[in-house]
């Protein structure tokens, strides 16, 4: 962020609310906003605070103010509206754990900000790091290109599904090509997240839930394929095998909400019988980074074939989630999976298009599989089209069934 500011603006003011610069600016803000009865009010108190912090401040479009780790101060966070309305300078506000800003003393400046969510690298971005994006973009989906090109892309996919897209992890792999070093980096990132989360929880027991929750989410993705009635209850059963009285539903909900707000996990909703009018929210969880997913799935003790299948589903979930959030093409507020009550079956993903209002099914197979439920839904008219994503096939199209090459 500092590199971006220094390279694109004549002047940059960087303030990190967890460092000394944050303490200094808070002191400047307190001094600028201090008022006693009978005194005239400073209508430009925020600009006064910036000038107290940096005497060379110029309020124009050649200046950028970067406020990092904004969640550390409600007093500064609540000035975002003033920054947006009264300053000519650009203001960039960033935060790592914005779940804290849901607390009552944080005022959300709706309409005054452009929000950008920083997520881990997508597979396309991962390929771009290694100079393979153009190959990925141009390659034929049904096996018409060179065998070695498909093999090369598959090798990168197999790495990506194990290490994910956290920049520090990708840099480690780019430099050393050592998966074990990448796993060590992922472990460090998890430890940092847990340790930094301690500052936002009054009950240390809440923090101790995280490791158990990660493991419980991984196990639940393997055990339950049709969604559950109450995810909190199911996760509680896995995280604590017996009723020890150590954990309340409120604590668990708090921890889950924190993981969601911190963009560690996301959820999928269930469409009963592929009916977009019968949606049950929060029916399944997924990890929002493939490396984190692999780390905890591989520690459940499941075989690699099982883990690989769940990772393939997680990969497709992330692709659908980005498509849903970044475009107007897909219905819903979260990706959907579906059940078919007639045969007590499950479809991995169900998409209702807002472009042609057709129903699309997506079946994910890490190896060759029969996709019984998906084919039944297509045959019975519940689906208009079916995509079967599986293994290292060469793909093909048969009527309304499409199997891209793996």
Task: Describe the residue ranges of each PLM region.
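Conserved catalytic segments around the Walker B and adjacent sensor/switch elements
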Residues: 6-27
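Active-site beta-strand-loop-beta-strand hairpin of nuclease catalytic cores
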Residues: 7, 11, 351-361
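Conserved P-loop NTPase "ATPase switch" module shared by AAA+ and STAND
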Residues: 55-76
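Structural recognition of the conserved hydrophobic beta-strand(s) that form the central parallel beta-sheet
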Residues: 66-68, 90-96, 117
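Sensor-1/coupling segment of RecA-like P-loop NTPase cores
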Residues: 85-106
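Interdomain motor-coupling "hinge/lid" segment immediately C-terminal to the ATP-binding subdomain
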Residues: 104-223
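Accessory nucleic acid-recognition modules appended to NTPase machines
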Residues: 175-347, 351-354
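Catalytic cores of nucleic-acid endonucleases
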Residues: 364-405
């Amino acid at each position: 962020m500092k590199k971006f500011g220094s390279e694109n603006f004549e002047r940059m003011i960087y303030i990190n609310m967890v460092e000394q610069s944050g303490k200094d600016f808070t002191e400047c803000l307190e001094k600028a906003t201090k008022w006693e009865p009978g005194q005239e009010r400073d209508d430009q108190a925020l600009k006064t605070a910036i000038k107290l912090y940096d005497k060379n401040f110029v309020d124009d479009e050649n200046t950028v103010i970067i406020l990092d780790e904004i969640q550390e101060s409600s007093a500064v966070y609540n000035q975002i509206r003033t920054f947006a309305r009264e300053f000519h300078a650009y203001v960039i506000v960033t935060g790592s754990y914005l779940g804290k800003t849901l607390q009552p003393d944080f005022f959300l400046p709706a309409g005054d900000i452009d929000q950008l969510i920083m997520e881990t690298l997508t597979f396309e971005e991962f390929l771009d790091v290694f100079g393979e994006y153009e190959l990925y973009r141009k390659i034929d989906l049904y096996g018409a290109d060179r065998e070695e090109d498909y093999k090369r892309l598959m090798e990168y996919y197999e790495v990506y599904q194990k290490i994910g897209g956290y920049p520090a992890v990708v840099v480690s792999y780019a430099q050393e090509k050592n998966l074990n070093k990448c796993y060590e980096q992922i472990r460090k990132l998890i430890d940092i997240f847990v340790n930094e989360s301690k500052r936002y929880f009054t009950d240390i027991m809440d923090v101790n839930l995280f490791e158990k929750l990660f493991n419980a989410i991984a196990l639940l993705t393997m055990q339950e394929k049709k969604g559950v009635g109450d995810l909190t209850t199911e996760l509680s059963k896995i995280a604590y095998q017996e009723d020890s009285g150590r954990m309340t539903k409120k604590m668990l909900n708090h921890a889950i909400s924190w993981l969601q707000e911190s963009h560690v996990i996301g959820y999928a909703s269930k469409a009963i019988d592929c009916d977009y009018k019968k949606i049950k929210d929060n029916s399944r969880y997924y990890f929002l980074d493939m490396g984190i997913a692999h780390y905890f799935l591989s520690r459940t003790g499941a075989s690699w074939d099982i883990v690989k299948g769940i990772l393939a589903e997680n990969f497709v979930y992330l692709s659908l989630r980005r498509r849903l959030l970044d475009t107007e093409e897909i219905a819903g507020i979260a990706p959907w999976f579906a059940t078919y009550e007639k045969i007590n079956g499950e479809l991995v993903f169900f998409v209702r298009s807002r472009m042609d209002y057709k129903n699309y099914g997506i079946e994910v197979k890490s190896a060759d599989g029969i996709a019984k439920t998906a084919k039944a839904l297509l045959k019975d008219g519940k689906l208009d089209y079916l995509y079967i994503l599986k293994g290292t096939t060469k793909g093909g199209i048969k009527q309304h069934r499409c199997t891209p090459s793996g």
